[in-house]
Swiss-Prot record:
<keyword id="KW-0426">Late protein</keyword>
<dbReference type="Pfam" id="PF04559">
    <property type="entry name" value="Herpes_UL17"/>
</dbReference>
<keyword id="KW-0231">Viral genome packaging</keyword>
<comment type="subunit">
    <text>Interacts (via C-terminus) with capsid vertex component 2/CVC2.</text>
</comment>
<dbReference type="GO" id="GO:0019028">
    <property type="term" value="C:viral capsid"/>
</dbReference>
<keyword id="KW-1188">Viral release from host cell</keyword>
<feature type="compositionally biased region" description="Low complexity">
    <location>
        <begin position="210"/>
        <end position="224"/>
    </location>
</feature>
<comment type="similarity">
    <text>Belongs to the herpesviridae CVC1 protein family.</text>
</comment>
<comment type="function">
    <text>Capsid vertex-specific component that plays a role during viral DNA encapsidation, assuring correct genome cleavage and presumably stabilizing capsids that contain full-length viral genomes.</text>
</comment>
<keyword id="KW-0946">Virion</keyword>
<dbReference type="GO" id="GO:0051276">
    <property type="term" value="P:chromosome organization"/>
</dbReference>
<keyword id="KW-1048">Host nucleus</keyword>
<feature type="region of interest" description="Disordered">
    <location>
        <begin position="200"/>
        <end position="244"/>
    </location>
</feature>
<dbReference type="InterPro" id="IPR007640">
    <property type="entry name" value="UL17-like"/>
</dbReference>
<keyword id="KW-0167">Capsid protein</keyword>
<dbReference type="GO" id="GO:0042025">
    <property type="term" value="C:host cell nucleus"/>
</dbReference>
<protein>
    <recommendedName>
        <fullName>Capsid vertex component 1</fullName>
    </recommendedName>
</protein>
Length: 702
């Protein structure tokens, strides 16, 4: 819950009134994280106690519907609880009294908060996506991105109504625990338990409380013990709130109060009608009940007898003053205003409700209080949701005292699903599957109500497929296909007219290795074919971990940064920050040459090539410095490109000039940038999703 607290404070401090938005607290289940490829052991590594300290990083991003626009990646507070994630907020634990609130064990989860963009009326686009990047290391292989469309993220309503039973059960568990402690319980806890028992009655239903309970009386514990608090029961119990019900209840309560006030005013008016003020009366300003009565008495011209004064000033004398001690003649309207003593009565420190008595007893038992304990002792809404990408569960949490979505202190505008409802109704009316299949008249009507649909409905070539829940996944696959197509074209172009493969990287060979060189030369075509098959068979997520994909990102980020103070660099640290400082810096992936051709490197190997690889002379290469000494090393990382007979190497520089290196340093060059054709909006969308801004300059350290 502390992560939710921190995100809420950050959201409240950085909130921009000109950009309406909301915040949603979620608990992503361990099953959902594991299905997304997150190793749970990495989230608790070095934390044997499973504490709140995190050794991972979480960032969030908002991705607009169809346009490809994204907000920059922003850090968010997060905490992983290995077990009882939902139970930790429904039944918190006092360290000195771990048996206070029994609960049914449940799964762990990640506490985090996601921003939700909306318009001034709170209307959000259900196809907008909230992206969450969880990284447990600096490498691309140590990060996963989870995507949540607003349609699956924002619940229809809260479920505070389902929490009433938990609060009553919490009170009863407290009473029984204090009764078991007996004389060892603090006096304040015993008194609170007695009040709670009296207020709940034998049936557990709140009953009117007596005016006082003897401090020496113990709590009356009756009935059978309550079952432990069950998170699963809470998630599946009926009791969903309705937006109209909450509004109606508040409206009815206000109307009842206003009706009572109106009746009281009418009654007073009938007894003491307001009379016209004489023109000769002195002017005066009255504040408070007694001043108003004095002014009314002075200017009304009515009788000034004791009975009349009794009626006018009954109960309104200043504290400590005798009633009508002076029976003198009439005074000016403002004469006695300064003699009226206005006092501030301090609020009583005595609890006035069962919840406040629970607060008193809890503080006495725990020796203090914490914000998360306080929020757990108030109403909590937990809504079970399902993640589209992993088909696993996550929970949307709302706290009564929260300013995030569903909180009773949430600031306007309130999130509205009006757009999602309108799209569903329009498609149902015309019996079409997707909104862009609607008739022109229906689309125009939607655009008049929701101008934000201009891009998805009217753009001739949207960056992402509109009205598609899987548009982000399809976009990544489309970029991978474009990159592979460009690589294939560049390799074919380089080998047309007879291959020019010679030893571009210098290595010395002995006479006994001539037979081996002939064997490698004979296998060149097979190795190339297997290399392309290995790349084509790479999953989209894994493809963006390769040296080729990272070089593409660096290339696009450098293009987007021309004329600007900042450029885009890949999110991970797989390639050194100074990779983009020189055309001589290359990032290589190594592939096996025996058996199946597989990529052997977890991250690219960065080298510096001294010399012109495009010329006829031989060049030399060396490793780039700056690799962390704590990074795990594979055997292949000990060899330079072409140095070992076991590896086929594919590398690129910042301009996407590639080098295919066979064993022995035999290589040919390719110009992949000439065949990679991405429209500017598409290239920008790729950069925003896979990169972050960084200040330009040589030797940049991110």
């Amino acid at each position: 819950m502390n992560a939710h607290f921190a995100n809420e404070v950050q959201y409240d401090l950085t909130r921009d009134p000109s950009s309406p938005a909301s915040l949603i607290h979620v608990i992503i289940s361990s099953e959902c994280l594991a299905a997304a490829g997150v190793p749970l052991s990495a989230l608790v590594r070095g934390r044997p106690d499973g504490g709140a300290a995190a050794n991972f990083r979480v960032e969030t991003q908002t991705r607009a519907h169809a346009t490809g626009d994204c907000t920059p990646w922003r850090s968010a507070f997060a905490a992983y609880v290995p077990a009882d994630a939902v139970g930790a907020i429904l039944a918190p634990v006092i360290p000195a009294h771990p048996d206070l609130l029994p609960r049914v064990p449940s799964a762990g989860g990640l506490f985090v908060s996601l921003p939700v963009a909306c318009d001034a009326q709170g209307v959000y686009d259900p196809y907008t996506v909230a992206a969450l990047r969880l990284a447990w290391g600096p490498w691309a292989t140590c990060a996963r991105v989870l995507l949540f469309s607003y349609d699956e993220l924002v619940p229809p309503n809260t479920r505070y109504a389902a929490d009433g039973a938990r609060l009553m059960r919490l009170c009863r568990h407290f009473c029984r625990y204090v009764a078991r402690l007996g004389a060892a319980a603090p006096a304040a806890a015993t008194e609170a338990a007695a009040h709670l028992s009296l207020g709940m009655g034998e049936s557990g239903t709140p009953t009117p409380q007596a005016s006082s309970v003897s401090g020496g009386a113990g709590p009356a514990v009756v009935g059978t013990p309550d079952p432990p608090i069950s998170p699963e029961e809470q998630l599946t119990a009926p009791g969903g709130d309705t937006a109209t019900a909450e509004d109606v209840s508040i409206t009815q309560e206000n109307e009842e109060i206003l009706a009572l006030v109106q009746r009281a005013v009418q009654d007073v008016t009938r007894r003491h009608p307001v009379r016209a003020r004489p023109k000769h009366a002195a002017s005066g300003v009255a504040s408070g009940l007694r001043q108003g009565a004095l002014v009314h008495q002075a200017v009304s011209g009515g009788a000034l007898g004791a009975s009349d004064a009794e009626a006018v000033l009954a109960g309104l004398e200043p504290p400590g003053g005798g009633r009508f001690a002076s029976r003198g003649g009439p005074r000016a309207a403002g004469e006695d205003v300064l003699n009226d003593v206005l006092t501030l009565v301090p609020g009583t420190a005595k609890p006035r409700s069962l919840v406040e008595w629970l607060d008193r007893g809890w503080e006495a038992l725990a020796g203090g209080d914490r914000p998360d304990w306080l929020w757990s002792r108030r109403s909590i809404s937990v809504v079970l949701r399902h993640h589209y990408g992993t088909k696993q569960r996550f929970v949307v949490v709302s706290y009564e005292n929260s300013v995030a979505w569903g909180g009773r202190r949430a600031r306007p505008p309130r999130l509205s699903s009006e757009l999602a409802t309108a799209l569903t109704e329009a498609c149902a009316a015309e019996r079409v599957v997707r909104p862009h299949q609607l008739s022109p008249a229906a689309q125009t009507a939607l655009l008049r109500r929701f101008p934000a649909l201009e891009g998805p409905l009217r753009h001739p070539r949207p960056v992402l497929q509109p009205f598609d829940i899987a548009a982000e996944v399809a976009f990544v696959a489309r970029i991978q296909i474009a990159c592979l197509r460009a690589l294939g074209h560049s390799i074919r172009a380089a080998l047309q007219g007879g291959p020019r493969i010679f030893q571009r990287l210098r290595y010395d060979f002995g006479p006994h290795q001539s037979e081996w060189l002939g064997e490698v030369t004979r296998r060149f075509p097979v190795l190339l074919e297997n290399l392309m098959r290995a790349l084509e068979g790479t999953a989209p997520d894994a493809f963006f971990h390769t040296a080729y994909a990272l070089a593409v990102l660096a290339h696009l980020g450098g293009q987007g940064g021309r004329g600007r103070r900042r450029r885009l660099v890949p999110l991970s640290d797989d390639i050194p920050a100074r990779f983009a400082d020189s055309d001589a810096h290359y990032a290589f992936d190594y592939y096996s040459t025996s058996g199946d051709t597989l990529r052997l490197t977890n991250r690219p190997i960065a080298v510096v090539i001294d010399g012109d690889v495009n010329g006829r002379e031989q060049s030399k290469c060396r490793f780039m410095e700056g690799s962390p000494s704590t990074a795990p090393h594979r055997v292949c990382e000990q060899y330079l490109p072409g140095e070992s007979y076991a590896y086929l190497c594919l590398g690129f520089n910042r301009r996407l000039c590639g080098l295919v290196v066979f064993p022995g340093g035999f290589a040919f060059t390719i110009n992949t940038a000439a065949y990679l054709s991405l429209a500017d909006p598409v290239a920008r969308a790729v950069g925003l999703r896979f990169c972050r801004g960084a200040a330009t300059g040589p030797g940049l350290v991110r």
